[in-house]
Every structure is written in structure tokens, then in C-alpha cells.
Amino acid sequence: MKLTSHDIIRKPVITEKSMAAMAEKKYTFMVHVNANKSQVKRAVEEVFDVKVKDVNTINGLGKTKRMGVHVGKRSDYKKAIVTLTEESKAIEFFDGLQ
């Protein structure tokens, strides 16, 4: 399956910790589970028109949930923490959230 830039970046992660990291030009996104670091870097540079210095990824396993006798599982996920270069501008998507 060929992933486009908009397929790779699912949604931003808005938490207290991720908001504090924005001061250091670190932005957190939920990304496609099959995307690798170079694909995430290319996608962020294309979509937001910024320069990426570093990408760290975290794989998360979905929790097992029960509803009575029925057992289900939430989807696995991947988060990417993207660090921008010093001369790069901030991502406008997050500007209104601070």
C-alpha cells in the first residue's frame, strides 16, 4: 500500500507534556503504524513546509477491553515526536493551542 503524506500523519497529540515540548520545537503526531521515520520526516516537511532535524517513534500496543463476556482489542498505534531545525518556523497548526 502506497502511503501519501496525508495518510501518514493521522492527528496531532495534544497533551500537557506535548504542549510543553513545543517550546523546544518538538511536535507529537499519531502516525500510520506502517510508516517509518524517513516517511514521517518527508510527510511533515511536505504538509507543514518546515525542516525536520530528528524523528523519534514510539510503538504502542492497543489495550484489551472487555464488555461482559465479550473481549475486544483497541488498535495498535504509533506516535512520532518530530524535532524541527532552529531556523525552521513553527507549525501553524499548533499556534492557536498554546
Curated annotation (Swiss-Prot):
| A GO CC annotation given for this chain | ribosome
Which GO terms fall under biological process for this protein? translation
GO molecular-function terms, A-Z: rRNA binding; structural constituent of ribosome
Quote the PROSITE patterns the UniProt record gives: RIBOSOMAL_L23
Matching InterPro entries:
Nucleotide-bd_a/b_plait_sf (IPR012677), Ribosomal_uL23-like (IPR013025), Ribosomal_uL23/eL15/eS24_sf (IPR012678), Ribosomal_uL23_CS (IPR001014)
Q: Coiled coil: which residue ranges?
A: none
Keyword vocabulary terms for this entry: Ribonucleoprotein, Ribosomal protein, RNA-binding, rRNA-binding
Q: Could you say which protein family the record assigns here?
A: Belongs to the universal ribosomal protein uL23 family.
> Could you tell me what this protein does?
One of the early assembly proteins it binds 23S rRNA. One of the proteins that surrounds the polypeptide exit tunnel on the outside of the ribosome. Forms the main docking site for trigger factor binding to the ribosome.
- Subunit record text: Part of the 50S ribosomal subunit. Contacts protein L29, and trigger factor when it is bound to the ribosome.
**Stated name of the protein:** Large ribosomal subunit protein uL23
- Please name the source species: Clostridium botulinum (strain Eklund 17B / Type B)
Its taxonomic placement starts with: Bacteria, Bacillati, Bacillota, Clostridia, Eubacteriales
Question: What gene, per UniProt, encodes this protein?
Answer: rplW
